[in-house]
Amino acid sequence: METLNYKVLEGTGYNGYILKDAPVKVMQFGEGNFLRAFVDYFYDIANEKAGYNGKVKLVQPIGNFPQMADWINEQEGLYTLYLRGSEKGQKVDAKRVISCVSDCVCPYIDGKWDEVLALARSANLETIVSNTTEAGIAYTQGDSQFDQVPPNSFPAKLTRVLFERYKAFNGAADKGLTILSCELIDNNGKELKKCCNNYAKDWNLEPAFIDWMNNANTFCSTLVDRIVPGRIRDPQELAALEEANGYHDAVLDVGEVFGVWVIEGPAELEDKLPFKKAGVNVMVVPDVTPYKKRKVRILNGAHTGFVLGAYLAGFDIVRDCMHNDTIRGFMNKMLHEEIIPTLPLDKKDLEEFASAVEDRFNNPFVNHELMSISLNSTSKWKARNMPSFLAYIDEQKQLPKCLTMSLAAYIAFYSSDIQERTADGLICKRPAGNTYKIQDDAWALDFYYAHKDDTAAQLVHAVLTNTQMWDQDLTKIEGLEAAVLADLEKIRTEGAEAAYKSCL
């Protein structure tokens, strides 16, 4: 079977949107599945819907997989993207051939770093995008030199690219770039800017350049939200798709339908970027923090809030939980009545985000295992659920029923017929009879193993007073110890599903 390129695609009779030739306006550090299913998808829609007329040049931030660049280039930048999931309760399986990518370069191959620097000198270049993993935004003194081909770290590469542009345009203020950092760390844009400043100082670059770098360029922190499985794992399904498409695609990509990109920047950036006009789910806001809080407390908080009890009730994957009226009802009540009222964003926006969560959890293409979500639940409950729990008590002057029950479910999950403490986990037995392995910090597992013979009352007291877990003594919250004990006993005697139902 022929490999995808423009000629092969034309021969298949594909009638979707395609843009073959356009100037390169975006330099993207990162060629992986996530950026291609997320950022490049948005740029592709912008070409179609907003007349952006721009291509994205991919730059591999590390040199350990140059074959990926070869695959992308053999396909002339084209690749097939499937967005799969559930939207408003309906199954979605949408295919689009993405044509916004010009090519991909591995700067560690002879001559290719020069290609990157040449793009830095281009008047057409407007934006730099990056996703170089959480470890990518880092500064280590002396690890990268100005004249290295290329410098080792990503921030060092970026500093060198910006200096090349500064020189090419004699420090013109209107030739600065918008830099959109997608790495999964807090304040990613601000951290990247700090690293670039450190390299500029290490390399003794002229003060006028440092001034231009900081003031003519806009370093944006961004929040990304789309689950990207990245590939189709079933070889038979993949073969059937290639047969239907009429070509082989070495870099085919798969993402969920839901996707939102929140960019922290000045208001005028919204008109500078092509996304608003394209009508895609990208927003420019003065502060990304409330949106991060929204994601952590609603999306992640929902997961941690219901999955532990759901597992004890006999469920194994998230989608099946969404098909159960009790579990789904418990999650929705927790979200809409206990979590959303404590968040500092527009209520309509929060309600829509929460509704999308149910669709995302109901994705017919993803078997998201409850046990994989259960990893490190002690720190997860503290980070994702406790802030909503405490804020609700502070505002409503009463205990939130569902969040209190979820705390009891956490204790029940960690103490269900404990069998043994192994080197890498705590082996428990669920009511259905099978054993399961809890994975968490060693001190948390040691705590539950040490308390395995406690009465329910002793265990609840020990958990709530454990300041290593919660940074405070939760028994000081009026009525909480008695409520958690009652909920734990209900889970143990009537089952977790019945306990969840009692909250509705």
Predicted regions and their residues:
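Substrate/ligand-engaging "lid" and interaction regions
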Residues: 1-504
